[in-house]
């Protein structure tokens, strides 16, 4: 059957069911879970360290765009239509939002009922980007995505800088029918508009 990650108890039960034909003990399953959790924690800690080092080296006019969205949208080259490579070709550094210190950013003052962990991370990324003049945001979504239908409006509201002025961002809705040329054109137009406002270095 399916493996439910709702909580540790449910996960342990489902994993035991899954490996039952392999004659694996409960103790071995617990040990495997602990090892997996530690590997995941170390992976995210590495991303955070890499992000902190990168941000500390940034110049005011470095061209950096944070890819905002769920990992299966932003990190998969097929789903994202190789967006990071397109940005590099335009002279822009793509930065995964997981490299930002999201755990340190509290959004409960405006969205205390956002129980969805991925939604919390996306809004935390928005708040960080809004207050960081060296970063721009590209929100990657899909056609007909239910959660994004309301999350995008929250993201738009939280994308305001410390002085209250809104910070623009690019929203890319990608699916199998999206043309490569269209993605390139929208990115170029976004970066050109930022340069015209004087908030972005020209290529």
List PLM regions with ranges.
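An N-terminal assembly and electron-transfer interface module characteristic of large anaerobic redox
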Residues: 1-203
């Amino acid at each position: 059957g399916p493996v439910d990650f709702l909580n540790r108890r449910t996960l342990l039960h489902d994993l035991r069911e899954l490996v039952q034909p392999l004659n694996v003990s409960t103790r071995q399953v617990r040990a495997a879970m602990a090892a997996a959790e530690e590997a995941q924690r170390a992976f995210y800690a590495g991303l955070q360290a890499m992000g902190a080092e990168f941000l500390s080296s940034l110049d005011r006019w470095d061209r950096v765009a944070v890819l905002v969205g769920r990992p299966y949208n932003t990190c998969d080259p097929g789903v994202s239509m190789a967006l990071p490579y397109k940005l590099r070709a335009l002279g822009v550094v793509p930065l995964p939002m997981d490299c930002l210190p999201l755990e340190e950013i509290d959004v409960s003052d405006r969205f205390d009922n956002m129980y969805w962990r991925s939604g919390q991370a996306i809004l935390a990324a928005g708040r960080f980007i809004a207050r960081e003049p060296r970063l721009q945001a590209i929100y990657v979504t899909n056609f007909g995505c239910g959660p994004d239908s309301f999350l995008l409006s929250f993201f738009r509201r939280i994308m305001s800088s410390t002085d209250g002025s809104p910070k623009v961002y690019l929203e890319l809705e990608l699916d199998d029918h999206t043309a490569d040329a269209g993605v390139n054109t929208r990115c170029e137009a976004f970066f050109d508009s930022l340069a015209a406002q004087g908030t972005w270095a020209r290529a």
